[in-house]
Amino acid sequence: MLIFDSGVGGLSILKNIKKILPNIHYIYMLDNESFPYGNKTEFFIIQRSIKIIHTIKKIYPINIVVIACNTISTVALSILREKFDIPIFGIFPHIKAAEKITKNKIIGLIATKATINSSYTQKTIYEYSCSNTIKIIGTNKLAVIAEKKIRGVAVSQKKLKNIFRPWINLPTCPDTIILGCTHFSLLEKEIKNILYKTRSVYFIDSIKKVIFQIKSYLKTSNVNQKIKKNIFLYSKNNNNLKKLLSFLKQYKFTVIKHINLN
C-alpha cells in the first residue's frame, strides 16, 4: 500500500489504517519538495501525482494507492484512475455528511485554495448550497501551521485569528465545520478555541469514509502483501525533516530514505 501527501497530514490516515489493519505493510511518500500542494497549479498537481505513483511502482510492488490529500483527490483522482491499473483511493471534503449534522444550516468549509477552486468542490458546493449556507475559507497557510506544530513550533493565535477573521465577525458562526485538508485535524483544538470558546462545534473530516472504503475493498478482494517492510520515503532532505524523525517513531518505519522525483 502506497500512501502519499506533500506533508504529514496524510499520517492521520495512516494512523487510522493501522488501527483497522494492524498487520498491513505500507509505504508513506512525503513529497516535502512540493509542500504544500494547495498553492500549485492543476497541471503541476496532476503531473506530480503521476510521477510519484509511476516512480514508486517501478521500485516497489504496490497494489493499492491512497491519496492522503484533498487537493490531489479533487484535482487528479479521476485522471490517475484512468492512467494506472491498480485501485486508487482519494479523500474529499465531506459536504454531504455536514448537511445531515448541521442544526443552524450554516456549514463551514476550510480547504486549500486549489481544493476550493477544483471543479469537483465547486459542483458539490453548488449542489448543497440550495438548502444550506456554506461559508468558505480557502487558505494555504493552515497546512504550514499544522506542519510546524508537528515539529514542535507553537501555534500562533494571531495567525489563526487572521485566517478565521471572516468567521469571527459573523453574527452566527457555522455549527459544523468540514476539514477539507488532512492537515487540519491536527489543529481542531486551536480552531475551536478561536471560534467557539463557549459553544460546541462539530468537525467533519473524511478520514473515516476513506478508511471504510479501503477496508471494504480489502474484504472483497484477494490482495497479497508483497511489501514486507514499512517504508518512509521523502523527496527533499532538509532541517524540517530531521525534526520530524522523532515523531515518526510511532509508525514503526524500518526504512527511511530519500527518493528522487525529478
Curated annotation (Swiss-Prot):
Its Enzyme Commission number(s) read 5.1.1.3
| Family annotation (Pfam families) | Asp_Glu_race
Reaction catalyzed = L-glutamate = D-glutamate
The answer to whether UniProt assigns keyword Repeat to this entry is no
Q: Which cysteines are joined by disulfide bonds?
A: none
Q: Which HAMAP family match?
A: Glu_racemase
Return the similarity comment: Belongs to the aspartate/glutamate racemases family.
Protein name per UniProt: Glutamate racemase
Specify the species: Buchnera aphidicola subsp. Acyrthosiphon pisum (strain 5A)
